[in-house]
């Protein structure tokens, strides 16, 4: 079930019910867990931001810092360390979930967090790690 606080009004068959709208999600886990969704740069709504001087980094600098499995793992680990510190969540359980191409990153991210950020995870979930099509 979806983890958010609200869900669409749907029939048992999955069709919208009139009047259209949302209802409380009885399966939401937000009363017992924090969920943070992280997208690597240029996926979802994640984008490269201008430098402190207001200029966009060069394409070469962007490739070096963001585009590639190893680059993604490095900056995501640094971001997670910063987020965990700022939100005072070091004592909270931490799980990573990666789907499709994200499984490669999550696998490496778990190791990077442990080796370079001193962050030990409670678990890792890999969804559809390969395409057998």
Predicted regions and their residues:
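N-terminal cap/lid subdomain of alpha/beta-hydrolase-fold enzymes
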Residues: 1-62
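Beta-sheet entry/capping signal
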Residues: 33-36, 92-96, 120-125
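Active-site nucleophile loop of the alpha/beta-hydrolase fold
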Residues: 40, 122-133
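Short glycine-enriched nucleophile-adjacent loop
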Residues: 103-115, 124
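Substrate-gating cap/lid region and adjacent catalytic-acid/histidine neighborhood
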Residues: 60-78, 112, 117-118, 129-133
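Alpha/beta-hydrolase fold nucleophile elbow
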Residues: 87-101
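Alpha/beta-hydrolase active-site loop
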Residues: 21, 28-33, 40, 64-86
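Secondary-structure transition/capping motifs at alpha-helix termini
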Residues: 86-91, 113-122
């Amino acid at each position: 079930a979806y983890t958010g606080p609200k869900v669409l009004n749907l029939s048992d068959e999955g069709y919208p019910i009139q009047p259209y709208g949302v209802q409380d999600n009885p399966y939401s886990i937000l009363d017992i867990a924090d969920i943070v969704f992280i997208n690597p740069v240029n996926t979802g709504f994640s984008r490269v931001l201008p430098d402190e001087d207001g200029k966009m980094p060069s394409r070469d600098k962007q490739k070096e810092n963001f585009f590639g499995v190893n680059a993604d793992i490095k900056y995501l680990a640094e971001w997670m360390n910063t987020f965990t510190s700022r939100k005072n969540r070091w004592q909270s359980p931490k799980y990573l979930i990666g789907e499709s191409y994200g499984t490669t990153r999550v696998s490496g991210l778990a190791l990077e967090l442990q080796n370079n950020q001193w962050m030990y995870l409670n678990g890792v979930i890999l969804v559809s790690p390969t395409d057998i099509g």
